[in-house]
């Protein structure tokens, strides 16, 4: 593993307990998978977090997120670290950069997908990371099915080699569960891009990103061809794994008339990301009805083919 990446993980593990000192955040994404869910098959250099109180109104939630990021900055200052907060348009401060002389870690809150599908768990740092970096602690983390659901959406959407590596490792360790698929449907429904573009979209060229931002991160060798095979398998498998109820829900949402009772998550209709998605679809239907219908038909046709 590359020393620069390892130094970044060391910084990440230094600040992680302060990031989760209060009970409003839980860890998600690659750091949750590789440092807590698995035994560090690859390094992970960012802290992606979910804001847990999904019932709060948007403005109140954003204020709480901004305040907690500021508090984290204050908590890590005695460690001799520098921090700066990054503002996003109309959202306030949603990212915190933590730096020392050699490394930088980004703490980023998903301000749209607030709340969780499943109850949060607490897990210890994996044994390999604990031994290598000499620390032990546990953090609040998304449940395994939900942790991978977000990763599956990311792997189809941005298609970063890191995401596809995590998918490959998932296949190596047992594969996609029905619970992951159910959570995946919720995360796909709350995603900012149109559902057919994510689920049935085009493949990106990964070669440059593989060399620039992936090589040196993994414990095991992993070729570009391996990642491409994992992506192809994922694209083929996920649409076929959807149940009739899940397909019906996604098609109903695409026409802005979702049947929420088709989902196992009883509070899905109240989750901010899904409410926002439905609101945007209703606006899309009013302003561009032909494009709206075409997008829904594209999803229906794609799901009917599998």
Protein language model regions, located:
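Compositionally biased terminal segments of proteins
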Residues: 1-306
């Amino acid at each position: 593993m590359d020393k620069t990446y390892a130094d970044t993980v060391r910084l990440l593990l230094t600040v992680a307990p302060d990031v989760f000192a209060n009970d409003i955040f839980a860890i998600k994404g690659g750091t949750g998978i590789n440092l807590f869910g698995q035994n560090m098959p690859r390094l992970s250099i960012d802290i992606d977090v979910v804001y847990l109180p999904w019932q709060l109104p948007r403005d109140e939630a954003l204020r709480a997120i901004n305040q907690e990021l500021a508090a984290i900055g204050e908590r890590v200052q005695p460690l001799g670290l520098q921090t700066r907060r990054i503002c996003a348009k109309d959202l306030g401060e949603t990212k915190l950069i933590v730096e020392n002389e050699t490394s930088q870690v980004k703490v980023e809150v998903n301000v749209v997908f607030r709340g969780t599908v499943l109850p949060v768990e607490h897990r210890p740092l994996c044994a390999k990371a604990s031994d290598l970096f000499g620390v032990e602690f546990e953090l609040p983390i998304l449940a395994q099915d939900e942790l991978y659901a977000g990763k599956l959406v990311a792997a189809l959407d941005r298609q970063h080699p890191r995401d596809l590596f995590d998918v490959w490792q998932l296949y190596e360790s047992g594969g996609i569960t029905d619970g992951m698929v159910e959570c995946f449907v919720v995360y796909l429904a709350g995603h900012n891009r149109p559902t057919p573009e994510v689920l049935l979209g085009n493949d990106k060229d990964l070669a440059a990103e593989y060399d620039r931002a992936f090589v040196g991160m993994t414990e095991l060798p992993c070729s570009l061809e391996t990642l491409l095979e994992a992506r192809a398998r994922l694209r083929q498998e996920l649409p076929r794994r959807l149940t009739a109820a899940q397909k019906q829900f996604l098609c109903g949402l695409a026409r802005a008339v979702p049947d929420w009772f088709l989902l196992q998550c009883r509070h899905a209709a109240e989750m901010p990301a899904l409410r926002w998605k439905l609101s945007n679809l209703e606006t899309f239907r009013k302003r561009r009805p032909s494009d709206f219908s075409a997008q829904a038909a594209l999803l229906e046709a794609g799901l009917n083919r599998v």
